């Protein structure tokens, strides 16, 4: 029986089939060869094959193709080889962009739900009722946007967990699921899930009227309790501001912050905005809070305000404004606990904003460092000029007193007393100005801020470093000069012996028996004695 019958194929040599040495054929779906089924011994034999042949593929593959396959295996997420630094950085950058995009979409759908909720609430009070089809359709739209928002929030936190794994080099996502993170995700999902559900549901709302203290009961919609908490979705705006901030996205800023142990979070971005444009931030925050609080009070007071005082939007804005400014005229008061709670939060927020406004105005009215230096220089110049004028007045009055008392035949006592009075005034003025100048100098010394001290310290450090470098260079030169002097001293010490050897060479040693034998054997070599005349 020939080898072809054993191989199961025509024209294929023995031992080259698919099952030879446990190697399987190439899987067309995966695009790579299947793993061998043999033990480690055969795998070692496959690794020891020549570089020109690929053990995992057909013969004739070049080494370049093998290297390309290895690079593809490294890029695959399921490969056993660890990813390179460039691959991790690229993956991290892509996750950053995806997280930013998800945050933008979440803010869009969150704001869309709030706008539709406000529209449905206003239309249900004046255009149609809660039982109408339009109200049901708008509530279904709110529910759809809420479901999409919840999905985006989950995807956002999934990207955050992936970023945590990339930053810390972890493989299991359960490592990142701490109790704090789980609680935060649960709270965020609960806040975003609150919305008015489709349908018409009512409850009995009891309250006590403000002026008459008469109990009041009214049938209110459940949508009121589910619509007001939807404004908590505005926290997504702070997240978008953080992710789109240039300080957060700039790699150099993040590196400097990491070196200085500064955490780039929403609090840091808010402080930065308050430093750059405090007036704009306070204005936008105050107006937004004013509008939201006024609409919330209107919704809370609608069912118990028969005279339509606080249930009117303009009346609610007036109530919120006088509460925000801590004035409290008392002409309008809320009836329900919901309205009272909103007014309480508005008063606390107004007190904080008032303090911030005072701080911002005080900072704007304060002179800058350059303006302080110019002002102090001008005041010092004026004080110096006034002191010189006072000293000149003292000398002048002294001369006039001497002139009217000694250089005239008949002194005029009234004129003398007048000049003496001016003399004393000039002395007191000079002393006072000198005291003012000393105090001005103290103020100038105290005006040196920490920035000036830090700058002076840095300048002193640079000067000391330069002096230290020059001292080290001078010490190196002195060491080199000392070594050269040592060499020169050794040369000078050896100079007399060298001169003596050059003038009077040493005589050869006295010939012994061995020298005589050598002289006898070699007649050309002879020995001449050295006389005293040769040495001079």
From Swiss-Prot:
Region Calmodulin-binding: list its residue ranges.
380-459
The answer to whether UniProt assigns keyword Transport to this entry is: yes
Q: Where is the composition biased (Polar residues)?
A: 515-536
What are the alphabetically sorted keywords of the record?
Calmodulin-binding, Cytoplasm, Ion channel, Ion transport, Membrane, Transmembrane, Transmembrane helix, Transport
Write out the similarity annotation.
Belongs to the potassium channel KCNN family. KCa2.1/KCNN1 subfamily.
Q: What does this protein do?
A: Small conductance calcium-activated potassium channel that mediates the voltage-independent transmembrane transfer of potassium across the cell membrane through a constitutive interaction with calmodulin which binds the intracellular calcium allowing its opening. The current is characterized by a voltage-independent activation, an intracellular calcium concentration increase-dependent activation and a single-channel conductance of about 3 picosiemens.
Protein name stated in the entry: Small conductance calcium-activated potassium channel protein 1
- Organism equals Rattus norvegicus
């Amino acid at each position: 029986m020939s080898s072809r019958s054993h191989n199961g194929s025509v024209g294929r040599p023995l031992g080259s089939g698919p099952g030879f040495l446990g190697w399987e054929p190439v899987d067309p779906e995966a695009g790579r060869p299947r793993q061998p089924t043999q033990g480690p011994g055969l795998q070692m034999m496959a690794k020891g094959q020549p570089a020109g042949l690929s053990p995992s593929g057909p013969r004739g593959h070049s080494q370049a193709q093998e290297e390309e396959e290895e690079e593809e295996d490294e890029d695959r997420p399921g490969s056993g080889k660890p990813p390179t630094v460039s691959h991790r950085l690229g993956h991290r950058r892509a996750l950053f962009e995806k997280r930013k995009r998800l945050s933008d979409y979440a803010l869009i759908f969150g704001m869309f739900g709030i706008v539709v909720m406000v529209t449905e609430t206003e239309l249900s009070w004046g255009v149609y009722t809660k039982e109408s089809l339009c109200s049901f359709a708008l509530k279904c739209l709110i529910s759809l946007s809420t479901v999409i928002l919840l999905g985006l929030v989950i995807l956002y936190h999934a990207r955050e967990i992936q970023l945590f794994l990339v930053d810390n080099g972890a493989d299991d996502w359960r490592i990142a699921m701490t109790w704090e993170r789980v609680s935060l995700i649960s709270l965020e999902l609960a806040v975003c899930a609150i919305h008015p559900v489709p349908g018409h549901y009512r409850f009995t709302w009891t309250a006590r009227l403000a002026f008459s203290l008469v109990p009041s009961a009214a049938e209110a919609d459940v949508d009121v309790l589910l619509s007001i908490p939807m404004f908590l979705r505005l926290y997504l705006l702070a997240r978008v501001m953080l992710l789109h901030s240039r300080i957060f996205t700039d790699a150099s800023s993040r590196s400097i912050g990491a070196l200085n142990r500064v955490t780039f979070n929403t609090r840091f971005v808010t402080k930065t905005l308050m430093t750059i444009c405090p007036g704009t931030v306070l204005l936008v925050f105050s107006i937004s809070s004013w509008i939201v609080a006024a609409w919330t009070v209107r919704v809370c007071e609608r069912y118990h305000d028969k005279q339509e005082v606080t249930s009117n939007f303009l009346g609610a804005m007036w109530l919120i404004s006088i509460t925000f400014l801590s004035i409290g005229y008392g002409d309008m008061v809320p009836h329900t606990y919901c309205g009272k709670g909103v007014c309480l939060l508005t008063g606390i927020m107004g007190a904080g904003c008032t303090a911030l406004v005072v701080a911002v105005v005080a900072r704007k009215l304060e002179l800058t460092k350059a303006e302080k230096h110019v002002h102090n220089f001008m005041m010092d110049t004026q004080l110096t000029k006034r002191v010189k004028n006072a000293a000149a007045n003292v000398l002048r009055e002294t001369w006039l007193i001497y002139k009217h008392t000694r250089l005239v035949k008949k002194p005029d006592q009234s004129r003398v007393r007048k000049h003496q009075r001016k003399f004393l005034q000039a002395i007191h003025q000079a002393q006072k100005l000198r005291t003012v100048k000393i105090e001005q100098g103290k103020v100038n010394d105290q005006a040196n801020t920490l920035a000036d001290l830090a700058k002076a310290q840095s300048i002193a450090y640079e000067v000391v470093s330069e002096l230290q470098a020059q001292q080290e260079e001078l010490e190196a030169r002195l060491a080199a000069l000392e070594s050269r002097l040592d060499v020169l001293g050794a040369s000078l010490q050896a100079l007399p012996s060298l001169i003596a050897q050059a003038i009077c060479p040493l005589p050869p040693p006295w010939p012994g028996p061995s020298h005589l034998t050598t002289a006898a054997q070699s007649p050309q070599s002879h020995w001449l004695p050295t006389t005293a005349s040769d040495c001079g």
